[in-house]
Amino acid sequence: MQIFVKTLTGKTITLEVESSDTIDNVKSKIQDKEGIPPDQQRLIFAGKQLEDGRTLSDYNIQKESTLHLVLRLRGGIIEPSLKALASKYNCEKQICRKCYARLPPRATNCRKRKCGHSSQIRPKKALKK
């Protein structure tokens, strides 16, 4: 049977499948046509995300049904070198006790006029883990 897969760009892909095919199988056919790895594909039918181990018949997908293809959301871990760089610029600071301005690590007086260039500064507190 023939089904259609609509991408976010509006492009429609036609696939030749059987109702006994698994969602994994459909994703690999999409990879063959479009080059998108299956682990980045999310298929939606009737408002539900399709699970990899199930078959097309489990979701009542019949001939000429349209599936919607969306890509997995990216994100997650920050690379350790970037985390160290960010902590150097964000965590190793001095804080003015009067106006709460962030100051360079070696500062002795506040740079702001509103607190009268106060010498009452403290190190910035460490982030909780």
Swiss-Prot record:
Keywords noted in UniProt: Cytoplasm, Isopeptide bond, Nucleus, Ribonucleoprotein, Ribosomal protein, Ubl conjugation
Classification via CDD domains: Ubl_ubiquitin
Top-level taxonomic group: Eukaryota
GO cellular component, as recorded: cytoplasm; nucleus; ribonucleoprotein complex; ribosome
Domain spans labelled Ubiquitin-like: 1-76
Covalent link Glycyl lysine isopeptide (Lys-Gly) (interchain with G-Cter in ubiquitin), residues: 6, 11, 27, 29, 33, 48, 63
Cross-link (Glycyl lysine isopeptide (Gly-Lys) (interchain with K-? in acceptor proteins)): 76
Alphabetized GO MF terms: protein tag activity; structural constituent of ribosome; ubiquitin protein ligase binding
GO biological process: modification-dependent protein catabolic process; protein ubiquitination; translation
Similarity comment text for this entry: In the N-terminal section; belongs to the ubiquitin family. In the C-terminal section; belongs to the eukaryotic ribosomal protein eL40 family.
PANTHER family membership: UBIQUITIN
Protein name listed in UniProt: Ubiquitin-ribosomal protein eL40 fusion protein
Species whose genome carries this gene: Cryptococcus neoformans var. neoformans serotype D (strain JEC21 / ATCC MYA-565)
Gene that encodes it: UBI1
